[in-house]
Amino acid sequence: MESDLTVEESETIKTRSRRPLTEHRRHSLLPLQWKLAHSSRWMAQVVASEFSLLAFLLLLLMVFSKKWLYPSKSRFHQRYPQNITKRVYTSIHSMSTGLLYICISKSCLSSDNEEDNFKMWTIHPAFGVAKISFILAVGLGFVLTVWLHLPYLPCLQRMPFFGLIGIILSFCEVTLIFLTLLLFPVNLWIYELKKNISVPIGWSYFIGWLVLILYLTCGILCYLNHKNFWSLIMSSSSINATCSSSVPVSLMNTSQISKSQADILDPTQDDQKPLSSDNIALPPNPDTTD
């Protein structure tokens, strides 16, 4: 009876020891690709949201900075009267304050060159389109930053069409910023050709290219998450691993099959040996005695 109990106890111990192993394999090895894919997806979402926040802060820096141009480093290639030179400097200074700057001081309102400034910097088509696109870029950048941070809220983690809307907002933002960065120097070059001067561009303009790269990266990451790029990579890697593991097995099977076929086609060594004279049975002699 004791021996039976010990056997039963040993069997129960073995089954208990095997059960966690199978459960560990079931819960750790199988969902490993799922965990890696979803962790990569979440990391891409975090990077996209933080890049959008950084890009929006740089946009605000562009709005409030007054270093779009360097008026002190401007060079005149033609001599002008003092009043015209003053007008040119005033125009360059108003342009260096950025696309969202509006002069409301008394000096701007009561100056004699007020009409000239409006004609040159606000009524000019390239400058007007650049100002509108920059205003839209700032507003859309705020919307995109808020949108990409919504998944941090637990109740909004499963929003439909989240990735698609993020892609559309990101690439619209990239288009608006690129249009602004393209039209601003075009307007400046037209003015330089008209007045025969050269004005260097400031660091606030070049920050816009960094903002463009950040928003473009956000759009690419949103596109990869929307197309389930990380799960596709994990599935392709698992398929390659299974194919590589099945190749040696198939080679072993083919070698075994070829060996068995060779054994069937070739006769054995016993069949190939010639019969000796001792082993040959002679027929009996006929009886000649009558």
Swiss-Prot record:
Keywords: Developmental protein, Differentiation, Membrane, Phosphoprotein, Spermatogenesis, Transmembrane, Transmembrane helix. The gene is Odf4. The modification Phosphoserine is found at residue 28. The chain crosses the membrane at residues 44-64, 132-152, 164-184, 201-221. This is Outer dense fiber protein 4. Pfam families: PMP22_Claudin. Residues 262-290 are annotated as: Disordered. Coiled coil: none annotated. It is a multi-pass membrane protein. GO terms for biological process: cell differentiation; spermatogenesis. It comes from the Eukaryota. It comes from Rattus norvegicus (Rat).
